């Protein structure tokens, strides 16, 4: 293969007539033929009709002059009924046009490397097609695609092979010399270049690269054994999982050592891994202790295994002795036995039931049968088998289908008119155990759960109750599951080596074998009363008593046809609405017209309907009822979007009596009759009340198409029957479900217990209260009739007022009760809107007629007291925590069938969406889907080819088919911005720690207070108190507000800013209510920061205000009460941090500064050193363009120590303004010089013309020089004077103690041998009673209390009393000498 042929040219160059946007066409069916006689190489050939259908725009393109044809790309996949670009596993392959092939044929060589990925997919979906491809070909589906150029390819090689390539062996050994249009590249010199060149040549041997493909290396084989080297493997491709190699593709090498099997050399790459008859899973596993089991039909057990065991497919061990004479094998390849030399296991030490030479009764969960195995300790004689006339059959675990299985996949293929509801599916290996063939009639009945141990049901009265119970059974057709729908059970078979002690007999009794599974329609399972286990047995062929010689009962037989049938409406909110009647009746007609239905008296019939289509047709002015019904009946399922289900119940059935043995026929078919809509008389007999199947144990919403199916897990087959996942259920939903179940239980109805009235309250809108109630009702099978109070008010309008509103409420509630009081829950949304006085009596009357009433409100205070007192339970729906948000996100993703990238961590997304409720999380998922679509459209537009979004999805990969982590990041950021606006939080600028200069000690204290509870909540889980209040105080302009914004940005917290006037209200009690609302919003939006700016105006000292009513005092009291709950260790207030800022802490109420409130006081002052000023200048000028000659250090040396942070900001802004002014003057001067020069241009030169034609980079760049800073400094007036700064230092000393210099003087002067100490500066100036600051001068008499000293006496808490003389009395208090945040390192 030549170098020029390694990478095919892009499609855009091949065909100049290719349209810019290609239209997506549906997939076509074709046959894949593997024939190595007519075609060689990796490129396949395509029949002419397929080429014309797939590439119609290339129909008239002339061929090349040299006769060569262009390589096109198509995507193939194993045939399935409904292929999808996003869910089907496609394989992109290169093809050429051929006119010699049969129509609808794709032909490849069996040794084509392009089919490696397809063979792997086929092995998972339909392994039997691998061995039958040579006879009739493989049925596939084919699409036209454009192969994308890959950005990055990750490959894996062994270390030894990598060294050989680096040494240049791959450069000299090539299959063919390079030839073609391009010139041969230069010989690489370095080992890395030689490795890259060899890898690019090796990958170039693949026409299309797929993730997981193996590729041969350009290395010579072994000189002695002539075994080729081990191949390399493509681990990952980006941005899609398959594409072509280009010159810009990056190759990332992953080195490693591949360990071969014991006693076996590593195999070379086969021509085709799976299409040569050997399954991929078995080609490497050929160790001596590996064997294939015979057709023993043993199922997976729960026995503990170790890594030493060998995985193999096993089958059920219940031989049942003589009962299985017809258990014949079908000569599959799986039944081949690989013999090995028998070896005796090593004797186990101690007492064991596993000894050499004795019957092995238990072997790691493998259970032998008491009849077939001699000397066994098991027996089949149990209370179950001892019952007389017990029906025999096989026991299966019942599993409801999550989607219908199409008839095209079944064998034998059912008739088109056969009822799909009368089918049951089991594994093919289980058909012989039942004793029938696929498509035969069997008897299915509900069965009890088998006993958990091997002793059977030896319960009290097990043998005495011998009366046969009536079983709920019916005839159905049994079919084997199509290939790929189920995985054969895998268990661990012990190897020849004795690796561990065998289990004893009693330990083995704890191992419960899993029964085989029978898949059945969830509606049919509900008609069988939803049992957990089913028993299948063939219908006995009765002796023929009629005329003729043909047998009476065959697989083609049908139950007797019905002559007359009565259908009852199951009253539900859908069937009760007049607007949906046409859709309901049309759906019922469609249900019986499509198939010959098999029903029995009492059966439930589920009919999915499109309510939106039915309502739109019903509202047409010229709509006729019967015509609309006919239109709805003729609508195809593909064209409808089913959103509701109408339920019906079968009443009386009268069959056609054709012979005298009608009773025997009825006994044979269990009362089931065929309903042919063309010959049956169908009557409606009113309404019936009934529950629907409970959704917590049934899959009927997915089966009927009301909900989308969840995406299959990784590694699961696309056709596998998915089981119902265990959904997230919140504790409140579980509690609500229990209340509803108790209120509607037969015991509560019989005892006439009072109804249950539940009020769901919340402080958020769109939190999911109505959805919670509806889902809880669906879990137990109750109907939910929702009434919106605002809709009633809008319909009532102004005419009638309260009277009409009351009448509408009564009418809606009566309609809801017509669905059955014990089967329907009445849901009233926004009950706070019903404020009229007559509503109390109306609600009382409604409660008398119903069993369950649920109401929702977002403002419980607006609900009238009379209405609120009627509710027996009041449940608050709070904002979801992290675990609940993760569960809600997972439920949304599964309900919408969204495929997530494996790297997406829903727990991390839940952490980022703090304070968002269920409605906001739905918005997050919707935004992520939009972001994914935009990302795919952006990728397709960048390629420069006619690439559509479908081409990306067909190419596969997480980036193309899944919602990635980046999509969720974009969605979360947008949702948080919307949430911040909805709750009234201000838009926070992007302020980080880099914008805050200095303040290192403040940053450390903030980290300790805020970051520790957020990152390590387990430290505070046991009630440990945490600090949640921080008070910033100091001169104005020192960065208190800036620091609060930086805290909110750095820790991703919601930010509330509260001003003093916002809390004041003229009405009594509203000001305190505003404080409560602020903290309630903060708790709902946690983690968040509540920032009280100018706290002295919000919470001044109580008793000093002269306002009437004491409004400020009440605000302070309410604020204190809210702050007391912030430091608790429980979860009710965690994540709420309160930050206050003030420049007058002496005016605050002293109660605010006590422990548990604002107990962390941080002083933000001015910078007292030039180094601190330099840090501030660097933070403010980090986005400036400074002249290279500027030295911020020299600028800082010339600044006074009275500048605050705001002054530094003004200094830098003025310097930038001066630089811009200087640069503008320079440009004006150059323009004047140009105008003065003689030139051909007439007229003045504009500034825009100068920048377009004459400007140099120096003219555009605005650089700030040192002279600009100095000029701005000369003009700047400090905002805080030196006298004011000294006052703030005195205030700081009041709260934190004297400065460090005074402390050192005190420690020098207070060295006395006695326990009493003299306090420096203890004389106080005072003219009355009160407290004075220690450190004053003058004469007086008072007490000075020194606390927190460093000597041994002070540590014992002794008090020094200093007496003096003066004109008054006072107390001089020396504060904590090691106070909080006394270190002013890095302050402004």
UniProtKB/Swiss-Prot annotation:
Q: Which Gene3D superfamilies does the protein's record reference?
A: 1.10.8.60, P-loop containing nucleotide triphosphate hydrolases (3.40.50.300)
- Compositionally biased intervals (Acidic residues): 310-323
Compositionally biased residues, Basic and acidic residues: 169-178
Enzyme class, spelled out: hydrolase
Q: Polar residues: which segments have biased composition?
A: 346-358
Q: From which residue to which does any coiled coil extend?
A: none
Q: Name the positions where ATP binds.
A: 1034-1041
Q: Which GO terms describe its cellular component?
A: cytosol; peroxisomal membrane
Compositional bias per record (Basic residues), positions renumbered to this chain: 14-23
- Which PANTHER family does the record cross-reference, listed alphabetically? AAA-FAMILY ATPASE, PEROXISOMAL ATPASE PEX6
Output this protein's name: Peroxisomal ATPase PEX6
Q: Which organism is it from?
A: Colletotrichum orbiculare (strain 104-T / ATCC 96160 / CBS 514.97 / LARS 414 / MAFF 240422) (Cucumber anthracnose fungus)
């Amino acid at each position: 293969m030549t170098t020029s042929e390694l990478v095919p040219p892009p499609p855009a160059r091949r065909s100049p007539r290719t349209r810019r946007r290609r239209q997506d066409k549906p997939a076509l069916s074709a046959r894949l033929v593997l024939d190595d006689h007519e075609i060689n190489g990796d490129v396949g050939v395509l029949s002419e009709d397929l080429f014309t259908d797939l590439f119609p725009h290339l129909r008239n393109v002339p061929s090349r002059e040299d006769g060569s044809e262009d390589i096109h790309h198509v995507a193939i996949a194993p045939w399935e009924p409904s292929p999808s670009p996003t869910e089907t596993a496609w394989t992109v392959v290169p093809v050429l046009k051929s006119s010699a092939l049969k129509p609808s044929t794709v032909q490849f060589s069996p040794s084509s490397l392009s089919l490696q990925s397809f063979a792997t997919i086929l092995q998972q979906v339909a392994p039997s097609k691998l061995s039958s491809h040579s006879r009739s070909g493989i049925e596939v589906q084919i699409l036209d695609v454009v192969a994308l150029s890959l950005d990055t390819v990750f490959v894996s090689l062994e270390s030894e092979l990598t060294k050989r390539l680096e040494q240049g062996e791959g450069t000299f050994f090539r299959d063919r010399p390079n030839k073609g249009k391009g010139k041969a590249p230069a010989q690489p010199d370095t080992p890395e270049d030689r490795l890259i060149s060899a890898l690019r040549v090796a990958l170039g041997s693949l026409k299309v690269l797929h993730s997981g493909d193996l590729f041969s290396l350009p290395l010579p084989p072994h000189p002695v054994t002539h075994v080729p080297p081990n191949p390399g493997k493509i681990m990952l491709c980006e941005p899609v999982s398959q594409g072509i190699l280009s010159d810009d593709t990056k190759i990332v090498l992953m080195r490693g050592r591949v360990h071969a099997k014991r006693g076996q050399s590593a195999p070379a790459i086969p021509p085709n891994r799976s299409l040569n008859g050997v399954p991929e899973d078995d080609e490497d596993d050929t160790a001596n202790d590996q064997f294939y089991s015979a057709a023993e039909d043993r199922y997976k057990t729960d026995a503990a295994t170790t890594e030493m065991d060998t995985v193999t497919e096993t089958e059920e061990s219940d031989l049942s002795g003589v009962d299985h004479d017809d258990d014949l094998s079908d000569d599959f390849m799986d039944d081949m036995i690989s013999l090995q030399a028998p070896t005796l296991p090593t004797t186990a030490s101690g007492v064991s039931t596993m000894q050499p030479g004795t019957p092995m009764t238990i072997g790691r969960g493998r259970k032998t049968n008491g009849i077939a195995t001699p000397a066994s300790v098991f027996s089949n004689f149990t209370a179950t088998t001892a019952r007389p006339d017990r029906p025999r059959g096989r026991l299966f675990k019942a599993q409801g289908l999550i989607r219908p299985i199409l008839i095209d996949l079944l064998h034998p293929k059912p008739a088109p008119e056969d009822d799909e509801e009368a089918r049951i599916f089991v594994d093919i290996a289980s058909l012989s155990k039942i004793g029938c063939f696929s498509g035969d009639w069997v008897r299915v009945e509900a069965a009890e759960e088998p006993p958990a141990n091997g002793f059977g049901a030896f319960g009290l009265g097990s043998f005495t109750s011998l009366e046969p119970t009536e079983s709920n059974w019916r005839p159905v057709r049994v079919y084997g599951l199509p290939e790929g729908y189920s995985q054969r059970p895998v268990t661990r078979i012990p190897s020849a080596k004795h690796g561990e002690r065998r289990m004893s007999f009693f330990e083995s009794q704890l191992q419960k074998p899993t029964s085989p599974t029978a898949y059945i329609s969830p509606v049919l399972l509900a008609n069988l009363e939803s049992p957990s286990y089913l028993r299948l047995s063939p219908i006995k062929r009765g002796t023929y008593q009629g005329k003729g010689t043909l047998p009476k009962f065959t697989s083609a037989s049908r139950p007797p046809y019905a002559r007359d049938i009565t259908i009852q409406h199951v009253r539900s909110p859908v069937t009760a609405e007049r607007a949906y009647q046409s859709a309901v009746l049309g759906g019922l007609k469609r249900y019986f017209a499509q198939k010959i239905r098999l029903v029995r008296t009492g059966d439930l019939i589920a009919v999915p309907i499109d309510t939106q289509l039915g309502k739109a047709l019903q509202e047409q002015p010229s709509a006729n009822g019967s015509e609309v019904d006919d239109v709805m009946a003729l609508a195809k399922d593909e064209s409808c979007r089913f959103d509701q289900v109408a339920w019906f119940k079968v009443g009386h059935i009268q069959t056609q009596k054709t012979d005298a043995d009608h009773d025997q026929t009825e006994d044979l078919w269990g009362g089931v009759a065929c309903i042919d809509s063309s010959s049956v008389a169908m009557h409606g007999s009113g309404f019936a009340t009934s529950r629907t199947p409970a959704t917590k144990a049934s899959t009927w919403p997915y089966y009927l198409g009301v909900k989308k199916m969840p995406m299959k897990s990784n590694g699961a087959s696309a056709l596998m029957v998915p089981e119902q996942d265990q959904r997230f259920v919140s504790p409140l939903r579980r509690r609500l479900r229990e209340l509803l179940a108790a209120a509607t239980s037969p015991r509560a109805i019989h005892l006439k217990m009072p109804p249950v009235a539940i009020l769901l309250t919340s402080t958020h809108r769109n939190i999911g209260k109505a959805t919670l109630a509806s889902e809880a009702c669906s879990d137990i099978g109750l109907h939910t009739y929702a009434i919106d109070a605002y809709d009633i008010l809008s319909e009532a309008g102004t005419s009638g007022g309260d009277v009409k509103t009351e009448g509408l409420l009564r009418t809606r509630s009566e309609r809801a009760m017509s669905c059955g009081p014990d089967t329907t829950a009445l849901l009233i949304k926004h009950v706070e809107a019903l404020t009229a006085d007559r509503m109390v009596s109306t609600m009382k009357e409604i409660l008398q007629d119903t069993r369950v009433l649920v109401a929702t409100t977002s403002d419980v205070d607006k609900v009238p007291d009379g209405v609120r007192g009627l509710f027996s339970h009041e449940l608050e729906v709070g904002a979801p925590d992290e675990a609940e948000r993760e569960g809600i996100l997972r439920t949304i993703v599964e309900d919408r069938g969204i495929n997530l990238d494996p790297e997406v961590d829903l727990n991390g997304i839940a952490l980022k969406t703090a304070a968002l409720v269920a409605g906001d999380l739905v918005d997050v998922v919707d935004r992520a889907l939009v972001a994914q679509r935009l990302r795919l459209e952006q990728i397709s537009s960048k390629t420069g080819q006619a690439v559509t979004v479908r081409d990306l999805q067909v190419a596969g990969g997480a980036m193309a088919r899944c919602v990635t982590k980046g999509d969720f990041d974009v969605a979360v950021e947008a949702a948080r911005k919307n949430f911040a606006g909805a709750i009234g939080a201000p838009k926070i600028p992007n302020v980080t720690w880099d914008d805050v200069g200095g303040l290192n000690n403040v940053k450390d204290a903030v980290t300790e207070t805020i970051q520790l509870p957020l990152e390590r909540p387990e430290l505070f889980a046991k009630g440990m108190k945490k600090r949640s209040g921080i008070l910033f105080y100091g001169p104005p302009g020192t960065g208190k507000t800036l620091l609060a914004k930086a805290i909110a940005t750095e820790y991703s917290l919601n930010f509330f800013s509260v001003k003093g006037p916002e809390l004041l209200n003229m009405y009594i009690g509203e000001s305190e209510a505003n404080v409560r609302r602020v903290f309630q919003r903060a708790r709902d939006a946690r983690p968040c920061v509540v920032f009280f700016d100018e706290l002295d105006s919000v919470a001044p000292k109580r008793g000093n205000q002269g306002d009437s009513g004491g409004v400020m005092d009440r605000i302070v009291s309410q604020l204190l009460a809210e702050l007391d709950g912030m430091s608790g260790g429980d979860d009710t207030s965690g994540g709420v941090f309160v930050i206050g800022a003030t420049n007058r802490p002496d005016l605050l109420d002293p109660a605010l500064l006590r422990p548990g409130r604002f107990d962390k006081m941080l002083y933000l002052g001015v910078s007292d050193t030039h180094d601190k000023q330099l840090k501030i200048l660097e933070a403010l000028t980090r986005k400036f363009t400074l002249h290279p000659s500027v030295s911020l250090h020299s600028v800082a040396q010339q600044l006074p120590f009275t500048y605050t942070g705001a002054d530094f900001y003004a200094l830098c802004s003025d310097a930038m303004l001066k630089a811009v002014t200087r640069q503008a003057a320079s440009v004006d001067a150059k323009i004047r010089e140009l105008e003065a020069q003689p030139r051909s241009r007439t007229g003045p030169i504009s500034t825009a013309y100068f920048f377009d034609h004459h400007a140099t980079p120096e003219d555009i760049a605005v650089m700030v020089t040192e002279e600009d800073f100095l000029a701005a400094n000369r003009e700047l007036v400090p905002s805080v004077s030196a006298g004011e700064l000294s006052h703030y230092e005195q205030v700081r000393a009041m709260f934190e103690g004297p400065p460090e210099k005074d402390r050192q003087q005190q420690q020098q002067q207070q060295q006395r041998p006695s326990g009493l100490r003299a306090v420096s500066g203890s004389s106080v100036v005072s003219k009355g009673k009160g407290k004075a600051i220690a450190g004053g001068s003058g004469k007086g008499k008072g007490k000075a209390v020194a606390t927190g000293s460093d000597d041994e006496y002070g540590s014992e808490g002794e008090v020094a009393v200093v007496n003096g003389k003066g004109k008054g009395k006072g107390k001089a208090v020396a504060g904590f000498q090691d106070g909080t945040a006394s270190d002013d390192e890095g302050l402004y």
